[in-house]
């Protein structure tokens, strides 16, 4: 019987009605077990069946991208870690592009495209903005969760319905020249295509930390979606030195201190001398971050703890490009080729020049600021910006070329 973790209680109910002894007569296999950790922060019910899972006499978990699990019941019940090692070259060649302006490279990839492209970006608004900015609405499809689908369709009704195709389920006939996939389609989903598309993953932490991709899980799972392979695999990413990069030991210590504080306040709460004191202590207890790491019963949710640690460790990699390089070099799943392209301007700078909601003075100041950073000889990206700026305000570009910044 195949079911989602959230629907497993229905199987138990049916088995009870039929007098079937599931725990002793059936084998329980949890597939894509990494999702128990990766998804528990927004799919709380995904780990509820685990108490039943441990009651099975015969059981196992499996994943192509496993995450170490800290729940003590695994050790208590003698679980073993079995690794299947291939005897052939299975690693994915990947181009890792570090930049401060992902949009330039997305535009370049689309401009040079000779085959369909699959973009994997964990922020639907980002996908939509790329599509609108490049004017590729009629050639694009977005595959996302139902709520995101409704939001995009609502946004389109507020303006002009520009023909973006938005779906919450994937089918091959819905594929387009440019295809954008949100996190809903990163794993547990197969694309069996007659052709091999180019695959582009985008992480723009300067725009949003929600675009962060875990190199050891998300990126591997994404590469595995194309069952017949792909033509090329690229990860375009930014970094941000403002992101904290804690060690695992520091995160574990933080959780322990939060737990100690929670237990202390809990003791005071249980022995509160009055309803007022109980309310104040209850509010204080609920504000403790540790409450997100326990079940309603008060028991520790080890999967939530693992999620907390994993999330911070993954996010911390995007503090510095060298950490990303190291993660890719240490990965067993990729053969990375590294590139770096730091531009004198970002996409946000370019939009100041382009959009109508900025004054002429603001636009001219930004154009001069950007042009002043260019060095001779101009590269193709510099030339592209100069051409765009010349189209928007030829006078200021000509003045800069003749007189320079100081004028």
Residue ranges and their predicted role:
Residues 2-5, 106-135, 142:
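Conserved strand-helix element at the start of the C-terminal RecA-like helicase core
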Residues 4-10, 122-125, 141-165, 182-184:
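Conserved helicase motor
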Residues 5-8, 16-60:
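SF2 helicase catalytic motif II
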Residues 8-20, 63, 127, 167-199, ...:
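SF2 helicase motor core recognition
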Residues 35-38, 67, 187:
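Residues immediately C-terminal
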Residues 64-111:
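Interdomain hinge/linker at the junction between the two RecA-like core domains of SF2 helicases
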Residues 206-233:
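Conserved SF2 helicase motif VI
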Residues 252-407:
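The feature captures the C-terminal accessory region of ATP-dependent helicases
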């Amino acid at each position: 019987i195949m079911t989602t973790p959230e629907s497993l209680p229905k199987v138990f109910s049916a088995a009870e009605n039929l007098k079937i002894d599931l725990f002793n007569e059936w084998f329980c296999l949890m597939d894509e077990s990494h999702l128990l950790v990766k998804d528990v922060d927004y799919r709380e019910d995904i780990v509820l069946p685990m108490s039943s899972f441990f009651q099975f006499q015969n059981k196992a978990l499996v994943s192509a991208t496993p995450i170490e699990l800290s729940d003590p019941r695994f050790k208590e019940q003698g679980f073993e870690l079995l690794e299947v090692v291939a005897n052939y070259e299975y690693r994915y060649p990947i181009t890792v592009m570090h930049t401060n302006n992902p949009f330039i490279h997305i535009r370049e990839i689309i401009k040079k495209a000779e085959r369909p492209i699959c973009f994997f970006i964990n922020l639907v608004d980002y996908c939509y903005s790329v599509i609108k900015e490049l004017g590729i609405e009629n050639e694009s499809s977005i595959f996302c969760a139902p709520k995101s689908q409704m939001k995009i369709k609502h946004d389109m009704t507020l303006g002009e319905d520009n023909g973006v195709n938005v779906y919450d389920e994937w089918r091959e006939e819905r594929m387009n020249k440019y295809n954008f996939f949100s996190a809903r389609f990163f794993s547990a989903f197969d694309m069996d295509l007659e052709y091999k598309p180019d695959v582009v993953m985008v992480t723009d932490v300067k725009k949003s930390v929600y675009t962060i991709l875990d190199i050891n899980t998300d990126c591997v799972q994404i590469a595995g979606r194309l069952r017949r392979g792909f033509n090329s695999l690229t990860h375009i990413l930014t970094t941000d030195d403002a992101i904290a990069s804690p060690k695992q030991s520091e995160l574990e210590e933080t959780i322990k201190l939060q737990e100690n504080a929670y237990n202390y306040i809990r003791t005071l709460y249980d022995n509160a001398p009055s309803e007022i004191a109980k309310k104040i202590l209850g509010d204080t207890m609920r504000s403790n971050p540790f409450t997100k790491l326990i079940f309603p019963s008060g028991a520790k949710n080890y999967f939530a703890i693992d999620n907390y640690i994993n999330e911070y460790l993954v996010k911390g990699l995007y503090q510095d490009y060298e950490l990303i390089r190291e993660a890719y070099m240490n990965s067993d799943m990729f053969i990375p080729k590294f590139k770096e392209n730091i531009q004198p301007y970002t996409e946000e700078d370019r939009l100041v020049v382009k959009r109508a909601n900025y004054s002429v003075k603001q636009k001219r100041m930004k154009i001069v600021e950007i042009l002043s950073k260019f060095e001779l000889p101009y590269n193709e990206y510099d030339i592209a910006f100069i051409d765009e700026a010349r189209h928007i305000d030829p006078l200021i570009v000509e003045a800069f070329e003749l007189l320079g910044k100081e004028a």
